[in-house]
Each structure stands twice: as C-alpha cells, then as structure tokens.
Amino acid sequence: MQLPLALCLVCLLVHAAFRVVEGQGWQAFKNDATEIIPELGEYPEPPPELENNKTMNRAENGGRPPHHPFETKDVSEYSCRELHFTRYVTDGPCRSAKPVTELVCSGQCGPARLLPNAIGRGKWWRPSGPDFRCIPDRYRAQRVQLLCPGGAAPRARKVRLVASCKCKRLTRFHNQSELKDFGPEAARPQKGRKPRPRARGAKANQAELENAY
C-alpha cells in the first residue's frame, strides 16, 4: 500500500510542477543547453531600420566622392597671376620722359580661388588635357612723350600695352608656338585641306605597263 501512495504523491508533484510552468509561460523553461524557448505563436520583431544606414549597398552622391568643404562650385575656373612690369619706351636715341607700367603674361595658369590678384579667367575643361599657357588678352593704347638728345624738340608716340591676360591651351594640331583658345569656337575643323590621293599598289602599276605594250 505504501508504494502506490508514493507513486501518487510523485504524480501529484509532477502535475503541480507542470501547472506552475504553464502559469509562468514557456520563457521560464530552459533546456539543457540553457536556451530560452520562445512562446509558441509569436515571432520576433525585425530590428528597426536605421534612417542613416551607410552599411547598405546604395549609391550616395551619384557614385561621386562627397563634396569637399574647401571646393567651390565653379572649380573649373583657372587664371593667370598678375605681374606688373615698368619700362621706358625708346625710339632710336629718344626715350620716354616717364616709365610706363604694363602686365607681363608669363605666369603659370592656376586655380582662380588660390590666386588673390588673379586677372582674366578661363575654363579648365580637362584637368589631364594639354598644356596651358598665360598669354595677353587685351591691350590698351597710351600716348607717351619722347625726349631726344641734342636739344631736339620732344615728340609724342602712341604705344600699345598689355591690359589683361588669359589662359589658353596648346592642342595636338599645333606646335607649342601656336595657342588655341577655350570654348566651342576652338573646336572648328580645318577647312581647305584636300584628301591625299591613295598610293597605287604594285598590281595596278603592272597592269598599266601591260596595257602600254
């Protein structure tokens, strides 16, 4: 009689334990691997998507590098450095009473934003293109008075001085002494050239010799 009573007590204890587990839910039940079993019928919510998610494979800025804070919108502008030169105007033995000041376009073309005293801006169409030079752009006329030795009467003369410079590029169609300007007008095809006649082959020459006989 004691054995059946003990079995009944064990069954009651096991039943009570299962009741307690069902009351607390499956989350309180752990298996041997110490893994929490999720509740049946419920699915874990997906993690919220970050607004500024940079791990996604998305093209940002149109596939271009981000805008540099020091770069201006018009970074294609290039200009010459302003160089002043003072000289006397001479005409034979006569020389001007006062020196004249003009610009010398011998500087190297560079970004206009980096040149504080830049003049005459041009467009840099291709950074890896041909060579660029700084050449005179506009001139101004100035009248100077020349003094001649020997007590001769002074005389006036009009000279042309450089007023501004600009950047021009060398092209592969010209040598380095010829410069080409920017813009769509620079890409004009050369007119007046006739196509070269094709050289005749040896077979054509042989046929003409046979017909000559």
UniProtKB/Swiss-Prot annotation:
Main location group: secreted
InterPro entries reported for this sequence: Cys_knot_C, Cystine-knot_cytokine, Sclerostin/SOSTDC1
GO CC, alphabetical: extracellular space
Coiled coil: none
Record-level GO BP terms: negative regulation of BMP signaling pathway; negative regulation of Wnt signaling pathway; ossification; Wnt signaling pathway
Domain CTCK: start-end pairs: 82-172
Residues with attached carbohydrate: 53, 175
Superkingdom of source: Eukaryota
Disordered: annotated span: 41-71, 178-213
Residue stretches of biased makeup (Basic residues): 190-201
Protein keywords: Disulfide bond, Extracellular matrix, Glycoprotein, Heparin-binding, Secreted, Signal, Wnt signaling pathway
Matches recorded under Pfam families: Sclerostin
Family under the similarity heading: Belongs to the sclerostin family.
The name this protein goes by in its record: Sclerostin
Organism: Chlorocebus aethiops (Green monkey)
Lineage summary: Eukaryota, Metazoa, Chordata, Craniata, Vertebrata
Gene that encodes the chain: SOST
